[in-house]
Amino acid sequence: MSRSKKSRKPGTNSNDQLVVVRTRSESELESRLRKKLKKRKGLKSGSRHSEGSESQVRQAAQKRDPRLGSKKPIPLIVAEPKKLNKQERKLAAEQELAMLEKDAQLNVLLDRLDNGEKLGIGLQKYVDEKLDRIEVLMEQLGLLDDEPEPAPAPQSKPTKKRKTEDDLLSEFEQLDVDKYQD
């Protein structure tokens, strides 16, 4: 029979406590393992390019997202835009004109102008641009009357004749300067 030792732990004087019995072979094995682990402090031996890394590269290639990279061909030359014929341009102009006539914001601003309100610079610019575009479209479609708008009636202020240089000079010479001194 092999020899067994009792372990000595402080406070184990009483017989009630558990006694640990170790055999010599167990303690030798434990000490060898501890010594072996103590010696190995660095990394495992081997080269950087081990066979295990090749399998990792293959796995990484398989895990790649299939959405990366499109198989759709990309045109290298920009195609020229298709030109519209007269009929298509006329339809497009009619649609744009109808859209401008239905523009709610433009209608509200025109109503405000009719009521005599003054618009801000930005709003007035917006109204002018839209009205100019409507005029161009109507001209393209042949809806615009060629008659010029009637000129506004002249105001009731009497118009003065333009004075000649001689009249202005005589008026200046007759001017009483003392009247303007304080």
From Swiss-Prot:
Entry superkingdom: Bacteria
UniProt biased composition (Basic and acidic residues): 23-32
InterPro entries, per the entry: YihI
Positions in coiled-coil regions: none
GO molecular function: GTPase activator activity
Comp. bias regions, Basic residues: 33-47
Record keywords, A-Z: GTPase activation, Ribosome biogenesis
Pfam families xref list: YihI
Gene Ontology biological-process entries: ribosome biogenesis
Annotated region (Disordered), positions in chain: 1-79, 143-182
Keyword Cell cycle among UniProt keywords: no
Quaternary context: Interacts with Der.
Family: Belongs to the YihI family.
Role, per record: A GTPase-activating protein (GAP) that modifies Der/EngA GTPase function. May play a role in ribosome biogenesis.
Name under which the protein is recorded: Der GTPase-activating protein YihI
Organism (species): Vibrio cholerae serotype O1 (strain ATCC 39315 / El Tor Inaba N16961)
